[in-house]
A protein has these predicted regions:
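Short gly/pro/ser/thr-enriched loop/turn and capping motifs at secondary-structure boundaries
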Residues: 48, 110-111, 214-216
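Metal-associated gating/positioning segment near the N- to mid-region
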Residues: 17-53
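Extended substrate/RNA-proximal surfaces in nucleic-acid metabolism proteins
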Residues: 51-176, 229-231, 251
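Hydrophobic "anchor" residues on beta-strands that sit immediately upstream
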Residues: 6-8, 40, 79, 101, ...
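Charged catalytic cores and adjacent phosphate/nucleic-acid-binding surfaces used
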Residues: 1-11, 15, 25, 94-99, ...
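Histidine-centered catalytic micro-motifs
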Residues: 8-18, 42-47, 136-141, 210-212
Length: 251
């Protein structure tokens, strides 16, 4: 049984750096403290459109989170990271080579969804792993929009299961995303619940992300706690509940 007090980390949050979120880094950190979290990952979208100033700002904000802000905030570990995008070219990747947490997900900004197939998405995730990404964000999202929305629920699930198989075989973290449930865009909640059952059978390691775009959402996982308990997902496979592993990875 997973309880709210068991969760000591939020591995997916956004701040005003993401341009469409509403809270600052400081507000998110304060919110994490209020929920008694010990770890918060700041994973603002990595836009990196090629502009020299923007490239510099993207890298600098990630490095500053870990090198400076983390040391100024006692009692909580601030993980400097970003939410990267499938199909995106990462500029100056050598400056990010020491980044421990490298999540990536499917977003419409860097791909043409209408002309993207399920196989294409699978191949993009595989390529992302080869490029050093060790966590896959919200794998249940966007599938209903691929290939002009022609895929059935069952076809989407088969594609998602292939991604899960790959993650299991290559020691990749899979995200259970709180906002996929409460937003439920195109049956994302149903796909998430379905793939979690399959991931449990495979013994996949997962992490919880609020995908907070407002500080009040940081560390708030009521829907995921309910779903994970219904499925009886093993607590030992959930990063957010594993203090020893979090310390090993981020301290």
């Amino acid at each position: 049984m997973i309880k709210e007090k068991d969760i000591i980390a939020d591995m997916h949050t956004h701040t005003t750096f993401s341009k469409h979120a509403f809270s600052s880094v400081k507000e998110n950190i304060n919110a994490a403290r209020e929920r008694k979290l010990k770890y918060i990952a700041i994973t603002d979208h990595y836009f990196g459109n090629g502009d020299d100033i923007e490239k510099k700002n993207e890298v600098n904000r990630i490095q500053y989170l870990g090198l400076r802000i983390n040391h100024m905030e006692p009692g909580i570990t601030v993980i400097g990271s970003a939410e990267f995008n499938l199909g995106q070219e990462i500029y100056t990747p050598e400056k990010l080579k020491d980044l421990v947490w490298r999540p990536i997900g499917l977003h419409s900004w860097f791909v043409d969804r209408d002309n993207l197939t399920i196989d294409d998405v699978y191949n993009l995730f595989v390529e992302a792993h080869y490029n050093g990404h060790n966590a896959f964000h919200h794998i249940e999202r966007e599938f209903h929009r691929l290939n002009h929305g022609l895929y059935s629920f069952e076809e989407c699930m088969e594609g998602i299961k292939r991604i899960i198989d790959y993650a299991h075989d290559n020691d990749i973290w899979l995200e259970a995303n709180e906002s996929s449930i409460f937003e439920n865009d195109g049956q994302s909640a149903e796909r998430l619940c379905e793939w979690l059952k399959y991931a449990k059978e495979k013994g996949c390691k997962i992490f919880l992300g609020s995908d907070a775009h407002y500080c009040g959402e940081v560390g708030y996982f009521p829907n995921l706690i309910r779903v994970l308990n219904e499925i009886e997902y093993p607590k030992e496979l959930i990063l957010n509940c594993n203090r020893e592993l979090l310390e090993k990875m981020f301290n």
